Regions:
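N-terminal nucleophile
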Residues: 1-168
Length: 168
């Protein structure tokens, strides 16, 4: 599962693997008080007893990032970061999935953000997507593309939950 939360002019927080539905809003509150994403992540690490089971990504409106992949998330799990972005995943075919996603995002700078994000998800799927530990392919069950402006309303909010072909 996953839980993205975005606040215009402030930033975005996404939690996945073992999701705490309150974590996104708990992370945005201190950011609203001036905490950096790294400081927020440190606070979450201390306050959340299940933190090692989660993946958490934070991107501020200024493109400052912090990311965590817990040591108890289901393999293959990891994350990569780039200039103002994070790609992260769990139960993946391997690191190559994240590498393909990062490359797709970086190569499409001239494309609208929503299309760029969709292309990034498709690149991950095409690179092997999700898989069991023995390499058996799993269909992506959920996906989201959410973009936000400076105001408190979204531009795009596309979500697919509990589907056999979430990225298709």
């Amino acid at each position: 599962g996953y839980r993205p939360v975005i606040r215009g002019g402030l930033g975005a927080v996404s939690t996945q693997a073992s999701v705490n539905l309150k974590l996104g809003n708990l992370a945005l509150r201190p950011m609203d008080q001036g905490y950096s994403p790294d400081k927020v992540m440190s606070k979450l690490r201390v306050d959340d007893p299940q933190f090692d089971y989660r993946q958490v990504g934070i991107v501020s409106a200024e493109n400052v990032i912090s990311v965590h992949t817990g040591c108890n998330t289901r393999p293959w799990a990891g994350h990569l970061t780039g200039q103002g972005f994070i790609v992260m995943g769990n139960v993946l075919a391997g690191k190559n999935v994240l590498q393909a996603m990062a490359e797709a995002f970086e190569q499409k700078e001239q494309v609208d953000l929503d299309e760029r994000l969709l292309g990034t998800l498709e690149a991950g799927r095409d690179a092997g997507g999700q898989a069991t530990a023995d390499g058996t392919h799993l269909n992506e069950r959920s996906a989201a593309v959410i973009t936000h402006g400076q105001k408190d309303f979204g531009h795009i909010d596309l979500r697919v939950d509990a589907s056999e072909a979430a990225v298709d």
